[in-house]
Regions:
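Positively charged, amphipathic and often flexible ligand-engagement surfaces
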Residues: 165-180
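Catalytic alpha-helical scaffold of carbohydrate-active enzymes acting on polysaccharides/glycoconjugates
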Residues: 1-164, 184-205, 212-254
């Protein structure tokens, strides 16, 4: 019986190890330092319903910030809406659920045509993260690494593939924690903000259109009203780091 218990425990450990594998860290080369505490507001537009996205844009206009929006081929806003909001940093959200790389590249081209230029940063669903080797020929940077379910990193890092990885903080993890108008969530975020201030960290805040309407707005407004941070788009941060560190990597498929 004890041996059966051992086999069961060993099997569970193997499954957990497989689930917890952070494949992006396999390509870690070095941490990229920033010159000042920096914040990026990013959104996964998994629901291209324009009134919901307008709420996000209106709030950012109120505070004078531009964000980075990752667009999916399966659900994106109209060409008219994209043109009217051309100051937004539009990038590509890949869907590897049931799709191989050739289909993902095809969808990337659809989004590139929609926004009128080539997207250079990719983010993939947490449900199905690709090996970075699959996307390195088409992007200069990735932002799929999730700071809540993996080792929390306050700074981007360069991979040995040449791509930059931008770890993000998703609001979706707090759906079941949201109590008392989010005061419990804010306590956690305050600790993160203090750490980022002290270390010239990079905070990439991720919100989605649907929860934004209910409580995601409060989370983003909490971040945007914090002092001591330079707010940039992810593309701006990427270009700054590539210049600072003289990163010459150019994807073959761009």
């Amino acid at each position: 019986m004890k041996y059966l218990h051992y086999l069961l425990a060993a099997s569970v450990r193997m499954l957990r190890k497989k689930y917890a594998k952070t494949k992006y860290l396999d390509y870690y080369e070095k941490t990229l330092e920033l010159n000042e505490p920096t914040m990026v507001f990013s959104h996964d537009i998994d629901e291209g319903y324009e009134p919901n996205i307008n709420d996000i844009v209106d709030m950012e206009k109120k505070y004078g910030v531009n964000s980075t929006m990752f667009l999916l081929a399966m659900s994106h806003p109209s060409k008219k809406w994209v043109n009217a909001n051309s100051k937004i940093d539009f990038q590509f959200h890949a869907n590897f659920i049931g799709n191989k790389i050739n289909k993902v590249v095809e969808e990337k081209r659809l989004i590139d045509d929609l926004i009128g230029k080539k997207t250079e940063i990719v983010r993939a669903h947490q449900y199905h993260l690709p090996d970075l080797k699959l996307v390195k020929d088409y992007f200069k940077a990735d932002s799929s690494y999730d700071n809540w379910t993996k080792l929390t990193l306050f700074k981007p890092f360069l991979t040995n593939l040449g791509m930059i990885e931008f770890p993000h903080l998703p609001e979706i993890e707090f759906i079941n924690l949201y109590k008392g108008k989010g005061e419990n969530i804010k306590k956690i975020y305050k600790e993160i903000i203090e750490m980022a201030r002290k270390t010239n960290g990079l905070l990439i805040v991720l919100t989605h259109p649907t929860p934004f309407k209910k409580w995601g707005k409060q989370i983003q407004e909490f971040f945007v009203t914090q002092d001591g941070f330079k707010v940039k788009t992810m593309h701006e941060v990427m270009n700054d780091l590539r210049n600072e560190y003289k990163i010459k990597y150019e994807p073959k498929g761009l």
